[in-house]
From Swiss-Prot:
Cited Pfam families: GP120, GP41
Gene expressing this chain: env
Residue segments, region V5: 454-467, 457-467
Chain residue ranges for the region called V1: 131-154
Protein name: Envelope glycoprotein gp160
Cytoplasmic compartment segments: 702-852
InterPro entries named among the record's database cross-references: Gp120_core_sf, Gp160, GP41-like, HIV1_Gp120
Chain segments carrying region V4: 383-412
Domains as described in the record: Some of the most genetically diverse regions of the viral genome are present in Env. They are called variable regions 1 through 5 (V1 through V5). Coreceptor usage of gp120 is determined mainly by the primary structure of the third variable region (V3) in the outer domain of gp120. The sequence of V3 determines which coreceptor, CCR5 and/or CXCR4 (corresponding to R5/macrophage, X4/T cell and R5X4/T cell and macrophage tropism), is used to trigger the fusion potential of the Env complex, and hence which cells the virus can infect. Binding to CCR5 involves a region adjacent in addition to V3.
Residues modified by glycosylation: 49, 88, 135, 138, 154, 158, 197, 234, 241, 262, 276, 289, 295, 301, 331, 354, 360, 384, 390, 396, 400, 442, 456, 607, 612, 621, 633, 670
Annotated region (V3), positions in chain: 296-329
Residues covered by region (Immunosuppression): 570-588
Keywords: AIDS, Apoptosis, Clathrin-mediated endocytosis of virus by host, Cleavage on pair of basic residues, Coiled coil, Disulfide bond, Fusion of virus membrane with host endosomal membrane, Fusion of virus membrane with host membrane, Glycoprotein, Host cell membrane, Host endosome, Host membrane, Host-virus interaction, Lipoprotein, Membrane, Palmitate, Signal, Transmembrane, Transmembrane helix, Viral attachment to host cell, Viral envelope protein, Viral immunoevasion, Viral penetration into host cytoplasm, Virion, Virus endocytosis by host, Virus entry into host cell
Residue intervals on the Extracellular side: 33-680
């Protein structure tokens, strides 16, 4: 028997040992499976082209004068602009392929066109002009240089009056640049306006000003503007010092050629930028590190007169010039300019292998290209820059720098008919400005072109000439350090977490389209950035809402206009675009079952073909931008798999939940499940112990009420009997005393039943007593409450009657008093009336007495 028992125990141990070994092998052979996890609010962006809107300082312009840039339609600038530096981020920039430049160019053209729409067309002036040289009537000698002969013409012409079928002869002064002689005229007295045969000339409205006002370009919600802060950035290639801003700096839309005015300066050295230095067709943009002040003036004291050209159309022209006809000119410091050229030459020699650098005048073309053209106080100046670009800088020399502080004086001419943006068919007439004109500007850059074809190794000289004419280069000189990116807040990455419970998630607070606040974590690793998703997402919806309010206020400010400006249209587009981005992201999150979540696990397994990097390599060493580039080709595939998985979960919710519990043996050893098991075990044991204690206490209380204390909670020993008292016989005869104990109870179930029965009886009696007490209390409170209510009701009736009686008495007394006073007043009136009636009688009686 002993041998059999040992054999049986050994077989039992062998069976359990085999099962444990099999389980250990299964656990050890199981590998960690990775699953796709969705992250919302990751610092990821992609290059994009979007509609930008403008911001401008509300105090930067005169409300009574309409500036051509329509900055009154822009949103107000942020008094505390935020610039967020992104550490450990390298981004590629390309100033030559920047959509911001194209957009600004189109905006400025549209603004000019729109500002001229309501203005007068000068088509009636396209007639024959009989002109002769103009001379001042009261000339006086002065130190200013006289205008060249024939620079201004006094022309007469026939024009329609306010009555259309009548003509009258008018006189006007024109600049020589604005008129051309008629071909068949040999006397040079017959002219026409220069653009009449090619363009429609529009006169600028009287209250339009061309003064450049800083314009800030801003990105709508869901987009951001990246800024390169490298001090020597050449405009193309990687930038290691990157920050994100909501708006650009204030860019003055200065329309000029050859020289860039009132722009931004380089922080350290002069910087030259070109799309391709070896290609002479490409313009070279020079950014100075120190500005050179240039002061321009038109000394002529002009007057302005009006000429009516039919009903509702007025043409403004120069009336008379008081004093000498002196030419306009600009002055700048010679030493500063030559020092600027010296720094430019140093940079050019680096690009062109230490060759001789020659600066020469423009090679020819339109006046806008040949001369430095710009707007000064409302007049368009065309200045000869030959003195600025007329020097040779030999190799290993400092050039022919002129000693002395004498200023450089540039002779300027004025042109009133401007070919707008070198476009065919559009010309503008700038009305003359009264009085003298002075303006001061800062030269902050140059536009240069290089002679020759491709870079020739055999030549030792490079010739550079002033260029311009393409206004895109003007805007490019300011926008070179910016680029627009589209925020991609949705990111996917592998984790060990899998979506376990398939249920409808509770909707959390909505998060809006991504704003720039979260980009501060762009340079952090994926693991570090994912820990701050909540902080990164706080400004998302608040940012879009605030921006929407600002845009709406700017749009409402334009309701008095018949049509929106270019900025108004852009603001509407920005509003719609921001809402679209927000709805698109929320739609994807809803389709994936991730609404309101920053981190959302899925049931889609991670495919190693997408990326075979380990979790530590991904989360500890890579940024979100690097990871996005890693899986960019598979993003759409992953999105579709997540969507398919969510659809399958919704179709088979119950079945998938049941199967998921038995997905792998490892779920049995999940720490969360074991903690739940331990919690249930502790609750059961604690409940049994507590129940046992309650039963013991109830038993003790019951026994104490019977007059003695038992030795045990359940086993009660019989009371001692006297020696003369028999214990009974086999037939259970004999006498039983009262103090004899009841039979003992054996077994757990019997003990449990006795205790449970005692508990229920005790609870029943106590609850019955409590119910009786509560019933008595409620009855007593009800009776007392009813008595109190009756007392208050009687009291209310009593005081109501008293108040009623008092009111009646007061009303009666008031009526009696009023009646008495009314009677007295009537009596007084009657007496007065009788007295008046008796006046004739008294007079008669008096006369009778007097006559007697």
């Amino acid at each position: 028997m002993r041998v059999k028992g040992i054999k049986k125990n050994y077989q039992h141990l062998w069976r359990w040992g085999g099962m444990m070994l099999l389980g250990i092998l299964m656990i050890c052979s199981a590998t960690d499976k990775l699953w796709v996890t969705v992250y919302y609010g990751v610092p990821v962006w992609k290059e994009a082209n979007t509609t930008l809107f403008c911001a401008s300082d509300a105090k930067a312009y005169d409300t009574e004068i309409h500036n051509v840039w329509a900055t009154h339609a822009c949103v107000p600038t942020d008094p505390n602009p935020q610039e967020l530096v992104m550490g450990n981020v390298t981004e590629n920039f390309n100033m030559w392929k920047n959509d911001m430049v194209e957009q600004m160019h189109e905006d400025i053209i549209s603004l000019w066109d729109q500002s001229l729409k309501p203005c007068v067309k000068l088509t009636p002036l396209c007639v024959t002009l009989n002109c002769h040289d103009f001379n001042a009537t009261n000339a006086t000698s002065n130190s200013g240089k006289m205008m060249e002969g024939g620079e201004m013409k006094n022309c007469s012409f026939n024009i329609t009056t306010s009555i259309r079928d009548k003509m009258q002869k008018e006189y006007a002064l024109f600049y020589k640049l604005d008129i051309v002689p008629i071909d068949n005229d040999k006397t040079n007295t017959r002219y026409r306006l220069i653009s009449c045969n090619t363009s429609v000339i529009t006169q600028a409205c009287p209250k339009v000003t061309f003064e450049p006002i800083p314009i800030h370009y801003c990105a709508p919600a869901g987009f951001a503007i990246l800024k390169c802060n490298n001090k020597k950035f050449n405009g193309t290639g990687p930038c290691t010092n990157v920050s994100t801003v909501q708006c650009t700096h204030g860019i003055r839309p200065v329309v000029s050629t050859q020289l860039l005015l009132n722009g931004s300066l380089a922080e350290e050295e002069v910087v030259i930028r070109s799309e391709n230095f070896t290609n002479n067709v490409k313009t070279i943009i020079v950014q100075l590190n120190e500005s050179v002040e240039i002061n321009c003036t038109r000394p002529n004291n002009n007057t302005r007169k009006r000429i009516t050209m039919g009903p509702g159309r007025v043409y403004y022209t120069t009336g008379q010039i008081i004093g000498d006809i002196r030419r306009a000119h600009c002055n700048l410091s010679r030493s500063k300019w030559e020092n600027t050229l010296k720094q430019i030459v140093t940079k050019l020699r680096v690009q062109f292998k230490n060759k001789t650098i020659v600066f020469n005048r423009s090679s020819g073309g339109d006046p806008e290209i040949v001369m430095h053209s710009f707007n000064c106080g409302g007049e368009f100046f065309f200045c000869n820059t030959t003195q600025l670009f007329n020097s040779t800088w030999y190799r290993n020399t400092t050039g022919n720098i002129t000693e002395g502080n004498s200023p450089i004086t540039l002779p300027c001419r004025i042109k009133q008919i401007i070919n707008m943006w070198q476009e065919v068919g559009k010309a503008m007439y700038a009305p003359p400005i009264r009085g003298q004109i002075k303006c001061s500007s800062n030269i902050t850059g140059l536009l240069l072109t290089r002679d020759g074809g491709n870079n020739n190794e055999t030549t030792d000289t490079e010739i550079f000439r002033p260029g311009g004419g393409n206004m895109r280069d003007n805007w490019r000189s300011e926008l070179y350090k910016y680029k627009v990116v589209k925020i991609e807040p949705l990111g996917v990455a592998p984790t060990k977490a899998k979506r376990r419970v398939v249920q409808r998630e509770k909707r959390a607070v909505g998060l809006g389209a991504l704003f720039l606040g979260f980009l501060g974590a762009a340079g952090s690793t994926m693991g570090a950035a994912s820990l701050t998703l909540t902080v990164q997402a706080r400004l998302l919806l608040s940012g879009i809402v605030q921006q929407q309010n600002n845009l709406l206020m700017a749009i409402e400010a334009q309701q008095h206009m018949l049509e929106l400006t270019v900025w108004g249209i852009k603001q509407l587009q920005a509003r719609v675009l921001a809402v679209e981005r927000y709805l698109k992201d929320q739609q994807l999150l809803g389709i994936w079952g991730c609404s309101g979540k920053l981190i959302c696990t899925t049931a889609v397994p991670w495919n190693a073909s997408w990326s075979n990097k380990s979790l530590s390599d991904i989360w500890d060493n890579m940024t979100w931008m690097e990871w996005e580039r890693e899986i960019d080709n598979y993003t759409n595939l992953i999105y579709s798999l997540i969507e398919d998985s969510q659809i399958q979960q919704e179709k088979n919710e119950k079945e998938l939940l049941e199967l998921d519990k038995w997905a792998s043996l490892w779920n049995w050893f999940n720490i969360t499940n074991w903690l739940w098991y331990i919690k249930i075990f502790i609750m059961i044991v604690g409940g049994l112990i507590g129940l046992r204690i309650v039963f013991a206490v109830l038993s003790i209380v019951n026994r104490v009420r019977q007059g003695y204390s038992p030795l045990s909670f359940q086993t009660r020993l019989p009371g001692r009997r006297g020696p003369d008292r028999p214990e009974g016989i086999e037939e259970e005869g004999g006498e039983r005393d009262r103090d004899r104990s009841s039979p003992l109870v054996d077994g757990f179930l019997a003990l449990f039943w006795v205790d449970l029965r005692s508990l229920f009886l005790f609870s029943y009696h106590r609850l019955r007593d409590l119910l009786l007490i509560v019933t008595r209390i409620v009855e007593l409170l009800g009776r007392r409450g009813w008595e109190v209510l009756k007392y208050w009701w009687n009291l209310l009736q009593y005081w109501s009657q008293e108040l009623k009686n008092s009111a009646v008495s007061l009303l009666n007394a008031t009526a009696i008093a009023v009646g008495e006073r009314t009677d007295r007043a009537i009596e007084v009136v009657q007496r007065a009336f009788r007295a008046i009636l008796h006046i004739p009688r008294r007079i008669r009686q008096g006369l009778e007495r007097a006559l007697q």
